[in-house]
A protein has these predicted regions:
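Alpha-helical hydrophobic helix detector
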Residues: 18-33
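N-terminal helix-rich module
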Residues: 2-6, 30-165
């Protein structure tokens, strides 16, 4: 048997391996960035839904006991929303229940300066809005005069809420 020394090259070269590693790392970084953006959007939507549920409970309370509940909001990072007497800051330890942002990067960006609240008769409300924001975008909570509470996203679309008109 005659052995020939002209065997074909098998395997991958160092440059090919480096190109594959570079492509994998680029795809991983891109996926991680997308995942972080998705997590931020999810946190924003969850906080907006929590605020919506808090306001629905206040609306139910106003309707059940036929009384008025006037809302207030304190803007800024880790802002808060509540009713009755407005404290000086969100960190004051008064006994009144209020909604405080659970995430450190959440912000109460904008809210209606006029009186906003619920009135027990016929489940009516004084219309207004509260806007929550983080790095993923912003969601506006809208309170209509008929007592409907809805969410919409400002700017870019967010999962789980339609865009504001």
């Amino acid at each position: 048997m005659k052995k020939s020394n002209d065997s074909k090259q098998q395997g991958m070269s160092l440059i090919e391996i480096l190109v594959v590693i570079m492509l994998i790392s680029i795809c991983s970084l891109w996926g991680m960035h997308g995942w972080q953006g998705y997590q931020q959007a999810l946190r924003l939507e969850q906080n907006a839904q929590r605020l919506r549920l808090y306001l629905i409970s206040l609306q139910t309370q106003a309707n059940a006991y036929n009384r008025s509940i006037i809302l207030w909001a304190i803007g800024g990072i880790q802002g808060c929303v509540g009713y009755s007497l407005r404290p000086a800051s969100c960190t004051s330890s008064e006994g009144l229940p209020r909604f405080v942002m659970s995430e450190s990067d959440m912000e109460v960006l904008d809210f209606t300066e006029k009186v906003m609240g619920f009135y027990g008769i016929r489940n009516a409300a004084q219309a207004g809005h509260i806007t929550l924001m983080n790095s993923a975008g912003s969601i506006r909570l809208v309170l209509s005069a008929r007592g409907r509470i809805r969410l919409c996203s400002e700017g870019k679309p967010m999962p789980g809420s339609p865009q504001c008109l």
